[in-house]
């Protein structure tokens, strides 16, 4: 899969939404997620990783080494069995697979590592984000939980976000009775008029070397996926979404040169003084304070 990364990375992503719902909250009628105390908008890490997975799947189309483990409506144990078959376990029933794995563990002390390496080698999202593989957990194998080198936090908006409900009507009718009554059907959709969000991420070269084998080629694909994660994911519900900035910090060594928070603090995003209600990206100014960044850390603006 290529050379494993040797440097630690942190990165900051800025993305915005215009007249859309970037991440609906099922606990609030699918309205945009909002911190109830600060009013800041929230987008979960799970939501963003889904976008990245979808982009990888679209670009690579199940190419060897770039399959996606976490897929919509696809049983995870189907992928787990691929690894089992590589070690000669061909059963399809979960109970039989679990028993066979327990026996294999007794006869082959390296079975855990072989299964883990197979999954990491074949599935990009396991290599990047890690995974919990229930089939192996049930068999008490240590490879059931893989911690990935790439981690994301929640995205938060720079300023408070207003959740606005819009009433919509549909000229199409559902039943003949509706046609007789000549009644339109009405519905509602929730949008945020505008929000600029910031998310911070981490990439551990140490975990890449010791666990998943996340490579330089994987890293370049990750940057490409982050930059384009909304480009093939447009929908009426999400409105206009775009990644505006990807700022990458590359350390000179595997364990890094300074704490991550110092690098994140060096990136300032501020609303322009003459703007009261921001409605576009140009209403903000993004600055990087180079004086707060060690000379051994390379800074690159990818967009």
Label the model's feature ranges.
Residues 1-303:
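RNA-binding basic/glycine-rich loop and surface signature characteristic of RAMP-family CRISPR effectors
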């Amino acid at each position: 899969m290529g050379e494993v990364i040797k440097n630690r990375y942190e990165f900051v992503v800025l993305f915005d939404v215009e007249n859309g719902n970037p991440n609906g909250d099922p606990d609030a009628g699918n309205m945009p997620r909002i911190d109830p105390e600060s009013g800041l908008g929230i987008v979960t890490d799970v939501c963003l990783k889904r976008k990245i997975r979808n982009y990888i799947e679209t670009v690579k189309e199940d190419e060897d080494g770039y399959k996606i483990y976490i897929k919509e409506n696809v049983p995870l144990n189907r992928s787990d069995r691929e690894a089992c078959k590589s070690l000669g376990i061909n059963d399809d029933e979960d109970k039989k697979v679990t028993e066979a794995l327990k026996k294999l563990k007794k006869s082959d002390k390296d079975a855990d590592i072989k299964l883990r390496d197979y999954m990491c080698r074949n599935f990009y999202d396991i290599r990047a984000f890690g995974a919990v593989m229930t089939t192996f957990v049930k068999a008490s194998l240590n490879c059931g939980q893989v911690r990935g080198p790439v981690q994301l936090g929640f995205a938060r908006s720079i300023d408070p976000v207003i959740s606005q409900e819009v009433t919509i009507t549909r000229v199409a009718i559902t039943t003949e009775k509706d046609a007789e009554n000549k009644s339109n059907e009405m519905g509602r959709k929730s949008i945020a008029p505008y929000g600029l969000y910031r998310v911070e991420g981490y990439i551990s070269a140490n975990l890449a070397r010791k666990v998943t084998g996340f490579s330089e080629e994987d890293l370049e694909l990750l940057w490409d996926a982050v930059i384009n994660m909304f480009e093939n994911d447009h929908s009426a519900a999400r409105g206009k979404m775009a990644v505006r900035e990807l700022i990458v910090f590359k350390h000179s060594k595997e364990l890094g040169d300074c704490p991550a928070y110092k690098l994140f603090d060096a990136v300032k995003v501020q609303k322009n003084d003459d703007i009261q209600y921001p409605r576009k990206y140009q209403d903000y100014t993004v600055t990087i304070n180079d004086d707060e960044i060690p000379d051994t850390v390379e800074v690159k603006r990818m967009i």
